[in-house]
Design a protein with these regions (language model features):
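Membrane-interfacial terminal anchoring regions of lipid-handling membrane enzymes
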Residues: 1-19, 36, 42-46, 198-219
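Catalytic core of membrane glycerolipid acyltransferases/transacylases, capturing the structured
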Residues: 2-8, 14-19, 30-32, 46-104
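Hydrophobic/aromatic ligand-binding patch that stacks against planar heteroaromatic rings
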Residues: 28, 64-65, 90, 116, ...
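Short gly/ser/thr-rich secondary-structure transition/capping motifs
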Residues: 31-39, 107-108, 163-165
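Generic preference for hydrophobic
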Residues: 38, 52, 75, 181-183
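Short acidic-hydrophobic, aromatic-tinged amphipathic segments that line or gate anion-handling sites
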Residues: 38, 97-100, 189
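Non-catalytic C-terminal accessory region of glycerolipid acyltransferases
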Residues: 108-219
Length: 219
């Protein structure tokens, strides 16, 4: 069914596609002995047109947030991830943008397109680290350039703290696993309008790290 939706993506509404993805995702999580604990769902803005900025631990991150989030969203992913089986179909169903970071013109066009769509009321997720951390729950530097979409769209920024998602695909274990997805309080435009993108990045990272420490993910 996922392949059919992916092959005929324009025949279905975003709500229909998202409902299917959640159903498949939760079935896969159950089969894989993975429990997703969602925190702060009430912090997700009621009005569409916002950006998620999570820390990046691995290939499972988007699937964890998909399980936890009741509101449809899409993704800006790097080219390498867009070629991963199953994730490729998931991203197609999400109408995600695949960014080739070596192609500056293409990357700029993606930023412009996503900014336009966020202004029109779509929600997007960007990994501000640019690549996944190889140090578990310890995030890398959040890059200021990742926040250009938010500043151009003047949209709410929702920091997301992921804990232990790296264990899902990257450790090879079949033991039961619990991962945490924390939706933190949004930063609205009035709060960050006078900040540089590097300052926004540092503040979002600070909030994410604080949450990881508070909930026992800091080892």
């Amino acid at each position: 069914m996922l392949n059919r939706y992916a092959a005929n993506v324009d025949n279905y509404t975003e709500g229909e596609r998202y409902a299917l993805l959640k159903k498949i995702d939760r079935r896969a999580n159950k089969g894989g002995n993975i429990t997703v604990q969602a925190y702060g769902v009430e912090n997700i803005p009621n009005e569409n047109g916002f950006m998620f900025y999570p820390n990046h631990q691995g290939l499972y991150d988007v699937l964890a947030i998909l399980d936890a989030c009741p509101t449809p969203f899409s993704v800006v992913a790097k080219k390498e991830v867009g070629n991963v089986p199953f994730l490729r179909q998931v991203f197609t169903c999400m109408k995600a943008y695949i960014m080739d970071r070596e192609d500056i013109r293409q990357s700029m066009q993606v930023i412009l397109n996503v900014t336009k769509e966020v202004k029109e009321g779509r929600n997007y997720l960007i990994f501000a680290e640019g690549t996944r951390s190889k140090n578990g729950n310890h995030p890398l530097e959040f890059k200021g350039g990742s926040f250009k979409v938010a500043t151009k769209a003047r949209c709410p920024i929702v920091p997301v703290a992921l804990i232990d998602t790296y264990k899902a695909f990257d450790t090879g274990s079949i033991e039961p696993l619990t991962v945490q997805v924390h939706f933190l309080k949004p930063m609205y435009y009035d709060e960050y309008k006078d900040m540089k993108t590097t300052e926004i990045a540092a503040e979002v990272k600070r909030r994410v790290e604080e949450t990881i420490k508070e909930y026992g993910g800091w080892d």
